[in-house]
Curated annotation (Swiss-Prot):
Family affiliation: Belongs to the cyanase family.
Key word Lyase present: yes
Record-given protein name: Cyanate hydratase
Pfam family, one: Cyanate_lyase
SUPFAM superfamilies: Cyanase C-terminal domain, lambda repressor-like DNA-binding domains
Catalytic reaction equation(s): cyanate + hydrogencarbonate + 3 H(+) = NH4(+) + 2 CO2
Organism of origin: Paracoccidioides brasiliensis (strain Pb03)
Enzyme Commission number(s) from the entry: 4.2.1.104
Gene designation per UniProt: CYN1
Catalytic residue list: R103, E106, S129
CDD domains for the chain: Cyanase_C
Length: 163
């Protein structure tokens, strides 16, 4: 377990995160659990699970029970922290300063119009939902031993209404 890479949180660098973030990350570090392990234990996707930790996704009542068990956090306390609705989007500065998050922003900045054009040609005039949405991250290793990040976005297509 000591060689596992674990995402941690320095709350002083993220002052806009909800108080639940510090509690969740402290328990995650104490238990030495990856998001993959936590997600498996609660029956959620690992990105969705991480989004709960960052206050960007709503935890269901079932999620709260399972997180409480997996992380060893008092259920009523965790419920008091996670029962509200997320205040999405205010947790970071814009443009992002973290290099990896900035690269994701840069991908959309550089390829956004290309994505839009191709999607419009395939689906018509509309948008890809970020609400009826799922995502996943996979690791791929090529024949030369190079690691590649494979990020999949899957959003429902929403055509614009004519009125």
């Amino acid at each position: 377990m000591s060689n596992i890479n674990l995402a941690t949180l320095d709350i002083s660098e993220h002052p806009n995160l909800p108080s639940s973030s510090a509690v969740l990350f402290e328990a995650k570090a104490r238990k030495k659990l990856s998001f993959e392990a936590i997600a498996s234990a609660i029956g959620r996707n690992e990105v969705a699970t991480a989004a709960i930790f960052y206050g960007q996704a709503k935890a269901s009542a079932e999620d709260i029970v399972k997180l409480s068990e997996v992380l060893g956090i008092d259920h009523l306390y965790l419920e008091s922290l996670l029962s509200g609705f997320p205040d999405r989007g205010k947790s970071m500065t814009f443009p992002p300063k973290d290099p990896l998050i900035y690269r994701l922003f840069e991908i959309v900045q550089n390829y956004g119009y290309a994505y839009k054009a191709v999607m419009n040609e395939k689906f018509g005039d509309g948008i890809m939902s970020a609400i009826s949405f799922s995502t996943k991250v996979e690791k791929e290793t090529d024949l030369d031993g190079n690691n590649w990040a494979v990020v999949t976005w899957r959003g429902k297509w929403l055509p614009y209404s004519r009125f």
